[in-house]
């Protein structure tokens, strides 16, 4: 048998007959058309709109609007307070590699950000970090050190 356009047939069960609702009991979907006896879901003009709860205040109006959506690509930092630099020698150069080597930071996974919590007793530090808070920068520079921002 050759394959031609006039010899094509759909597979058995692939073409189902359209249900004709409300056309008599012999059709199987007569009278109530499969919508049950009474109630709002059996009436014409159905269905109710999405989110409608029968007149009760719907959930999407009961719950407050969401504010402050999270950032899609937030910046992650390894944060360190200036009080953690108290064990270093005067005039030392501080960067992420030296902090890992000294055991102050455990993992160099993210760039370093210096925070200004605590007191800085070490003098003349050269701190190389990706970001500084204003208080950290003022405390390091007040102790005679310099802040170098890395890219």
Curated annotation (Swiss-Prot):
GO biological process, one term: translation
Residue spans crossing the bilayer: none
Bias type Basic residues, positions: 12-23
Keyword Phosphoprotein belongs to the record: no
InterPro entries tied to this protein: Ribosomal_uL15, Ribosomal_uL15/eL18, Ribosomal_uL15/eL18_sf, Ribosomal_uL15_bac-type, Ribosomal_uL15_CS
Keyword annotations: Ribonucleoprotein, Ribosomal protein, RNA-binding, rRNA-binding
Family: Belongs to the universal ribosomal protein uL15 family.
Subunit and partners: Part of the 50S ribosomal subunit.
Function: Binds to the 23S rRNA.
Protein name as catalogued: Large ribosomal subunit protein uL15
UniProt gene name: rplO
């Amino acid at each position: 048998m050759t394959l031609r356009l006039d010899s094509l047939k759909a597979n058995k069960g692939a073409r189902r007959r359209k249900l004709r609702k409300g056309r008599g009991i012999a059709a199987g979907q007569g009278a109530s058309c499969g919508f049950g006896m009474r109630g709002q879901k059996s009436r014409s003009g159905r269905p109710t709109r999405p989110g409608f709860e029968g007149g009760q205040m719907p959930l999407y109006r009961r719950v407050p609007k969401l504010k402050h959506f999270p950032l899609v690509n937030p910046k992650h930092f390894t944060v360190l307070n200036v009080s953690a630099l108290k064990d270093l020698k005067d005039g030392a150069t501080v960067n992420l590699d030296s902090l890992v080597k000294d055991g102050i930071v455990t993992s160099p996974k993210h760039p370093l950000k210096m925070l200004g919590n605590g007191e800085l007793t070490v003098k003349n530090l050269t701190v190389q970090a990706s970001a500084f808070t204003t208080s950290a920068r003022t405390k390091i520079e007040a102790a005679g050190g310099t802040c170098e921002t890395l890219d």
